């Protein structure tokens, strides 16, 4: 099976699975929804580890290296970088279209005040499920790209709580409700993670999570809405102040 076809099929299956799980858990709010998704990830990790015939168990699966466009494998890392950039631009384009559409405005209304949005006739459940399904589809596509790049798929890593925490931190630190926020968060967390792992080494396994916590505390204290949002607000305040000073 071609990895390109497998990528689309995996995306469709992930979207279907997300629809089912989302329908069962999306009615939960706040920390309860978060706890439900974390618990589900742990259950899936256990199932994946014990389903050795499909996943390779705790050792994972090695992907044979057969370079070529048809095999979605390339000898040059630069080519992978271009393909990854293409995925990023495509994802940002979809996010931008949703953000500027009626669906995007409805999602903002749900985020700000769910009960008020429901009272105004917004189909909260349907839109939440749509957001979850789209997210799962694109996450699956990028997961295929990652597997083709690393040539290795490991269930303990794919379903790890640590990875989920990293993704959440990227969004929170970068700025919720913006497309540029997660990019800024990833640009900060990814090199920080690499540096801390190299600096601390295996002797201090897990200690880097303390640094994540410190970064999160600093952001909550001084940039509560995230880097992107706070920077935009600071720029607007500066422009307003400059205009007032110019008018005397």
Predicted regions and their residues:
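Transmembrane alpha-helices and adjacent helix-loop boundaries
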Residues: 1-248
């Amino acid at each position: 099976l071609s990895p390109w076809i497998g990528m689309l099929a995996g995306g469709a299956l992930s979207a279907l699975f997300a629809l089912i799980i989302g329908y069962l858990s999306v009615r939960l709010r706040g920390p309860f929804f978060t706890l439900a998704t974390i618990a589900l990830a742990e259950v899936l990790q256990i199932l994946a580890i014990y389903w050795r015939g499909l996943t390779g168990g705790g050792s994972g699966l090695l992907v044979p290296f057969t370079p070529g466009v048809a095999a979605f494998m390339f000898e040059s890392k630069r080519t992978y970088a271009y393909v990854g950039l293409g995925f990023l631009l495509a994802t940002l384009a979809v996010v931008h279209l949703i953000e500027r559409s009626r669906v995007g405005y409805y999602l903002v209304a749900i985020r700000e005040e769910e009960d008020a949005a429901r009272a105004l006739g917004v189909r909260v459940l349907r839109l939440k499920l749509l957001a979850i399904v789209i997210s799962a589809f694109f996450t699956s596509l990028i997961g295929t790209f990652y597997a083709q790049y690393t040539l290795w798929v490991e269930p303990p890593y794919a379903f790890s709580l640590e990875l989920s925490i990293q993704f959440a931190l990227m969004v929170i630190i970068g700025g919720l409700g913006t497309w540029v926020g997660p990019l800024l968060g990833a640009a900060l967390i990814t090199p920080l993670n690499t540096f801390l792992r190299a600096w601390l080494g295996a002797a201090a396994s897990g200690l880097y999570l303390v640094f994540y916590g410190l970064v999160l505390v600093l952001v909550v204290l001084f940039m509560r809405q995230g880097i992107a949002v706070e920077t935009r607000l600071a720029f607007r305040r500066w422009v307003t102040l400059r205009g007032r000073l110019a008018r005397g």
